[in-house]
């Protein structure tokens, strides 16, 4: 099973999950059908975590890979908030903009990034994406009862932080180490984690899974064991039912069937499906709830 096929399975799982949320919100499906669709969706994140580690091992440009994840974290945040309007009833007021309680951490990032950009020998425009993503993470924007930006953060924040952590850990284990650079990266990771971990989709549990899979990267059986243990821990913590546990544990199938081949490249399409489908579902939620 190639990376292409595994990605398609994860995407289909995610789409079924989110579609189930919308259809149940509209009372178009029964509670049993909703439970099945949500259970299918539990397959997606552990597979994404596996793909992040696999992508890190195969990429020739970690910075570009990380920047892409951060960029889509920023791009996806408004669609993600619109989609989650189905869970909120907000007062029908005018424009409201608030800063989260940890906005000062974001301000530090913006200042440091600005100084780094202006003092660089060659301007690096990729710094815009982490600044934008972290700024959106601390903003809450509502307009006439519609949440445009909320406190909950989309899964790209978790995936990006997980990738950044394993990149720093990998650099720290090499023979040639730049300790000053590693210290700065560690501080940046701590700040980003402090800023987003409480609100990001899957949060600390998701980042921990990515790191654990990377540590076990040389053994498919160890990776499978970690994924199984993660599903058990998640089941014990949240207790969402056996069907969702089974949906999650099915992630072991592509891990064992992975043949190491890339397959047909999806390029940016793999990432774009996430904000596009959330934007469509979010628009439908807003339309049916407020129009």
For the regions a protein language model found, what residue spans apply to each?
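Alpha-helical transmembrane segments and their immediate juxtamembrane cytosolic regions
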Residues: 1-291
């Amino acid at each position: 099973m190639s990376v292409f096929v595994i990605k398609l399975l994860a995407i289909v799982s995610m789409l079924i999950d989110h579609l189930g949320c919308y259809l149940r919100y509209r009372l178009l499906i029964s509670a049993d059908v909703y439970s099945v669709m949500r259970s299918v969706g539990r397959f997606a994140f552990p597979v994404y975590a596996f793909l992040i580690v696999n992508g890190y091992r195969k990429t020739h440009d970690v910075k570009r890979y990380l920047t892409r994840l951060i960029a889509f974290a920023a791009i996806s945040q408004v669609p993600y908030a619109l989609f989650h309007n189905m869970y909120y009833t907000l007062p029908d007021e005018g424009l409201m903009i608030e800063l989260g309680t940890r906005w000062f951490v974001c301000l530090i990032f913006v200042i440091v990034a600005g100084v780094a950009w202006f003092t660089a020998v060659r301007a690096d425009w990729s710094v815009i994406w982490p600044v934008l993503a972290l700024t959106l993470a601390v903003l809450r924007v509502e307009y006439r009862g519609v949440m445009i930006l909320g406190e909950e953060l989309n899964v790209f924040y978790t995936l990006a932080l997980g990738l950044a952590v394993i990149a720093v850990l990998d650099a720290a284990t090499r023979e040639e180490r730049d300790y000053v650079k590693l210290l700065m990266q560690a501080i940046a990771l701590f700040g980003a984690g402090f800023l987003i971990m409480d609100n990001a989709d899957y949060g600390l549990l998701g980042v921990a899974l990515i790191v654990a899979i990377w540590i076990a990267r040389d053994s498919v059986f160890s990776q499978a064991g970690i994924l199984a243990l993660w599903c058990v821990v998640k089941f014990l913590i949240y207790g969402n039912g056996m069907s969702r546990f089974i949906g999650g544990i099915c992630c072991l199938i592509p891990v064992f069937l992975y043949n190491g081949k890339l397959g047909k490249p999806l390029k940016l399409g793999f990432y774009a499906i996430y904000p596009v489908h959330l934007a469509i579902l979010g628009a439908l939620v807003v339309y049916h709830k407020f129009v």
